[in-house]
Amino acid sequence: MNNDVFPNKFKAALAAKQVQIGCWSALSNPISTEVLGLAGFDWLVLDGEHAPNDISTFIPQLMALKGSASAPVVRVPTNEPVIIKRLLDIGFYNFLIPFVETKEEAEQAVASTRYPPEGIRGVSVSHRANMFGTVADYFAQSNKNITILVQIESQQGVDNVDAIAATEGVDGIFVGPSDLAAALGHLGNASHPDVQKAIQHIFNRASAHGKPSGILAPVEADARRYLAWGATFVAVGSDLGVFRSATQKLADTFKK
C-alpha cells in the first residue's frame, strides 16, 4: 500500500525556499482543526507545548486533516526522544522543537526522528504512520521525509544560531518571538528594537547556512515585515485568536 505522505511536500517546499503561510492550532479538537485544514493554509502547527494536546487528541486531528493540503506540524512539549518517537508513530512527519539553544540539542532532535544508523528512533513494525505495517517501503523512506524545525527563543540560542543552523538534518529555524522577548528583558514586547534586531539576525544567519526561517506573527504588519526580511514559513494567526476575535466582534456588534 502507498503512503500519501511520501514524498514530504512541505519539506521539499522549505528546501526550495517557497513561501509557506501557516496557522497555529491550539483549540485541540478535530472539528476546528478540520476547518483550518479547509482554509487553504500551507501548514498548521498542532501545539503540544502550550495547548492541552496529547497523543489522544493528536490522533483525531491528524485524521481530520487526511486529504487536506495543509501539512501538519507538531510542536512537541520538549526535546525528548520518547515523546518524539510516539508522535512519529502516530503519523507526524514535521516537527517543531522548542527552546533549542545548542548544536548538541539540535543534533538530539534530529537523531530522535531517524532510525539507526542515522539516529536513535525505536523500531515498531506496526503503527499508524506506516499504516499498521502495510507501507512496504516505510523504513526506507522515513528518515529522508522527516522535517525538523528548531525554535530559537533565548539569548543562548541567538548566540549559537550559526552552529544550530549548520546542523545536518535541521530543515529550518523558527523564532519564538514571545519567549525571545522575555529572554532579552522585554517580556510582552516583541516589537522592542532589541528583539526585532535579534529576529532579523536569526533570519540572516539561517539564510547564510542555506536554511529557511520562520516565525509566528498574528499581526499582519509584522508578518509582512518578516516576509520582507526573508522569512519563508510564517504562521499568520491562530485558531484560538481568530475565534476569540470574531466572537467578541459579533457580540459587540449587537450589544454596543
Swiss-Prot record:
Catalytic activity as recorded in UniProt: 5-dehydro-4-deoxy-D-glucarate = 2-hydroxy-3-oxopropanoate + pyruvate; 2-dehydro-3-deoxy-D-glucarate = 2-hydroxy-3-oxopropanoate + pyruvate
Note the superkingdom of the native organism.
Answer: Bacteria
Q: Which InterPro entries match?
A: Aldolase/citrate-lyase_domain (IPR005000), GarL (IPR017648), HpcH-HpaI_aldolase (IPR050251), Pyrv/PenolPyrv_kinase-like_dom (IPR015813), Pyrv_kinase-like_dom_sf (IPR040442)
Q: Which UniProt keywords apply?
A: Lyase, Magnesium, Metal-binding
* Necessary cofactors: Mg(2+)
Residues annotated for Mg(2+) binding in this entry? 153, 179
At which residues is there a site annotated Increases basicity of active site His? 89
Where is the catalytic site?
Answer: 50 (proton acceptor)
Q: What does this protein do?
A: Catalyzes the reversible retro-aldol cleavage of both 5-keto-4-deoxy-D-glucarate and 2-keto-3-deoxy-D-glucarate to pyruvate and tartronic semialdehyde.
| Protein name, per record | 5-keto-4-deoxy-D-glucarate aldolase
Q: Which gene codes for it?
A: garL
